[in-house]
Amino acid sequence: MSQSILTTRIMEALAAGRKALIPFLPGGFPDKERFFDELAALDAGGADIIEIGVPFSDPVADGPVVEQASLDCLLNGTCLSWLFYELGKRKGQYRAGLVLMGYYNPFLQYGLEQLAADAADAGVSGFIVPDVPLEESGPLREALDKHGLDLIPLVGLNTSEERLAAYAQNARGYVYFVSVLGTTGMRESLPTEVKERLTAVRRIFNVPVALGFGIKSPEQLYAFGDLVDGVVFGSALIAHIKAGGTAAEFMARWRG
């Protein structure tokens, strides 16, 4: 199988002497009309990968900022079929690789084979599913594999080396390292043990490492040096847009 477009985008960023930028934005936020304007602005502003959140009524891994934004999107009528239709109309317009991040129940209800086929047709390159354990990910992984889509593993501070090795066997695209215990959201500082665990992740995985959950500023990212290839930021971006800002302004800050 050829190298994932997600891996390629991260490697291109590293070759340019910078970390890969991976913004997260809930599908349909801040509203269904403006969402694609902000998506285009993220892409034009230098995003290497864009994670699009699929709204769900019980987002167990999300902090208050992302959770409220997702609930607002649900109330506005955001759903998978709408996302696929609208993304499909814009297929090929984005340089950034597109990843859908969502919970397993809506994906199961949609049908895993149909999910993978429609995602590929819409220009999506991968999925992150926080509530699917490794042992139960087989059917989803098989459906995604058929269409050349990546299932991005989520690992963190409490993931044992044995389990890291199990995730690494099938890892494609990149590995998402959860930098804190708990839900998403901005933190002023990150736990000191993050570097130690990242060292193990770097040793065990053969795909790029992206750091997320709790990232507030570029300075936090660069403190990790070569242990990290990219950064995922969601809560800070959402808060910026809610306060009247734009994705373009936010990306300019991260690009420096």
Swiss-Prot record:
GO CC annotation: cytosol
Pfam families: Trp_syntA
Source organism (scientific name): Solidesulfovibrio magneticus (strain ATCC 700980 / DSM 13731 / RS-1)
Family of the protein in this entry: Belongs to the TrpA family.
Entry EC number(s): 4.2.1.20
Molecular function GO labels: tryptophan synthase activity
Chain's role: The alpha subunit is responsible for the aldol cleavage of indoleglycerol phosphate to indole and glyceraldehyde 3-phosphate.
Gene3D superfamilies in the record: Aldolase class I
Chain's gene name: trpA
Keyword terms, alphabetized: Amino-acid biosynthesis, Aromatic amino acid biosynthesis, Lyase, Tryptophan biosynthesis
Record-annotated active site: 51 (proton acceptor), 62 (proton acceptor)
Signal sequence bounds: none
Reaction(s) catalysed (UniProt annotation): (1S,2R)-1-C-(indol-3-yl)glycerol 3-phosphate + L-serine = D-glyceraldehyde 3-phosphate + L-tryptophan + H2O
NCBIfam families: trpA
Name of the featured protein: Tryptophan synthase alpha chain
Assembly, per entry: Tetramer of two alpha and two beta chains.
Annotated pathway: Amino-acid biosynthesis; L-tryptophan biosynthesis; L-tryptophan from chorismate: step 5/5
